[in-house]
């Protein structure tokens, strides 16, 4: 992440101009919009995994920047440390997630009917299909439901009510491998360790660095070109 404090400060300035200090709940549409802006800014800060006391210092720095007060630290000296901090926090999050993920994958692999592939994916058939199986170069139409280890839904075509269509060789490795083992009309659960999902970078804000992902995938069709 490139040092982007200036952009964030500008956005915060808009929010601060619309909401009084110490405001509890946004009431007007403008206030709700600025509150939403604050939520978006918080997603940019997600990789830092800030504690409440740390967030107070971040808020103080952003407020001073917006109000053009004299900075309390030398930005040239401490600016580069922002990137160092992010890298350290992301690495720590990834290690924590991967450790929990390894235990989760091992448990999933021990369940009846589960099959662990050479890459580390765990595949469990939910419903057998009767059609063909796709090749990695095929385009497929699927319904899927993606969750984290704690059950949090991060993406779901099922919830959207609209199947997804994509080339099988342009998705995460776990999908490329796993969907090839589903026959048309079939449905399987894929447990995907981070190394064959989004890796140590994750896909913020929904997917943490090193996260293990769980998908229920129903293969509806192999799309003919």
PLM features per residue range, with description:
Residues 6-18:
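Bacterial N-terminal signal peptides
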Residues 2-4, 20-225:
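Cross-family detector of peptidyl-prolyl cis-trans isomerase
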């Amino acid at each position: 992440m490139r040092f982007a404090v200036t952009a964030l400060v500008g956005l915060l300035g808009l929010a601060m101009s619309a909401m009084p200090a110490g405001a509890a709940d946004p009431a007007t549409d403008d206030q709700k919009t600025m509150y939403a802006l604050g939520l978006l800014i918080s997603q940019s800060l997600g990789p830092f995994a800030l504690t409440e006391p740390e967030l107070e210092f971040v808020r103080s720095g952003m407020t001073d920047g917006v109000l053009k007060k004299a900075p309390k630290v030398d930005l040239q000296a401490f600016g580069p440390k922002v990137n160092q901090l992010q890298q350290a926090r992301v690495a720590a999050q990834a290690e924590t997630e991967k450790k929990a993920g390894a235990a989760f994958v091992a448990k999933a692999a021990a369940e009846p009917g589960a099959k662990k592939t050479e890459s580390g994916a765990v595949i469990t058939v939910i419903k057998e299909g009767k059609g063909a199986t796709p090749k990695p170069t095929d385009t497929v139409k699927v319904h899927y439901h993606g969750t984290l280890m704690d059950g949090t839904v991060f993406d779901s075509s099922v919830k959207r009510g609209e199947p997804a269509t994509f080339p099988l060789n342009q998705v995460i490795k776990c999908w490329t491998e796993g969907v090839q083992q589903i026959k048309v009309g079939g449905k399987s659960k894929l447990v995907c360790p981070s190394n064959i999902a989004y890796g140590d970078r994750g896909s913020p804000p929904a997917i943490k660095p090193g996260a293990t992902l769980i998908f229920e995938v129903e293969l509806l069709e192999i799309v003919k070109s």
